[in-house]
């Protein structure tokens, strides 16, 4: 019975992990970007070996990016820098990420917007 029980336990844990990821990602979908960043951070720390880590890091980056570009001017620079750090985390984890094209386009906008603050 032990191998069967272990298999069932593994399957249930995989389902829970997927559900936690989908719940965290949902915050991004409904444009609750601060909540998405926290939930995705928690997901990555709670499930360090997850197969969803690449996607979690991308959605955290996307949330940080969306929060930054939609911010009031006073908060924009700080949030752009947070988004930049999220991009670097994604690329450090997986340089050839499946989200690379979009991530690079978003990063170019971040760099352009940050230049406005250094003038």
Regions found by a protein language model. Give the residues of each.
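Acidic, polar-rich low-complexity tracts and alpha-helical solenoid repeat scaffolds
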Residues: 1-119
């Amino acid at each position: 019975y032990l191998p069967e029980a272990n298999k069932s336990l593994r399957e249930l844990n995989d389902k829970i992990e997927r559900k936690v990821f989908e719940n965290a990602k949902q915050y991004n979908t409904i444009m609750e970007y601060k909540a998405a960043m926290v939930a995705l951070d928690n997901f990555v720390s709670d499930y360090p070996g997850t197969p969803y880590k690449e996607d979690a890091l991308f959605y955290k980056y996307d949330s940080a990016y969306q929060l930054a570009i939609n911010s009031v001017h006073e908060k924009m620079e700080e949030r752009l820098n947070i988004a930049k750090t999220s991009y670097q985390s994604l690329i450090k984890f997986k340089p050839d990420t499946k989200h690379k094209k979009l991530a690079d386009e978003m990063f170019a906008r971040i760099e352009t917007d940050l230049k406005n603050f250094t003038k």
